[in-house]
Amino acid sequence: MNIQQLYEFCLSKKAVTEHFPFDEDTLVFKVGGKMFCLTSLKEWEKGTPALNLKGEPENNAEFSAQFEAINPGYHMSKIHWITVDFNSDVSDKMMCELINNSYGLVYKSLTKKLRDEIEKS
């Protein structure tokens, strides 16, 4: 997966928007105003891309033990977020599943009113 594929995959999800809330380097994808995926554009340029994704604590610990490329979230809650390195032992299919899971967790955390508004749009 390259940066363009990541970009298109994330934006293909319902109500997803892109932002640069921290600096011009950190691309953040949000649903309902809440982050579900972050990545550094400079790291993509250097050839060492990674994503920060939300996950369930029990799965995060299991993934970290199972995959060398999955670690506790960098600059994030180490319990609720993971950092996934690209170009390693995580397949593109698995990466998409992790992104989908992150999106789903954040979407479910939105208020019912906001979820209803998103569903109607």
Task: Tell me what each language-model feature is.
Residues 1-121:
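Charge-dense, helix-prone N-terminal extensions
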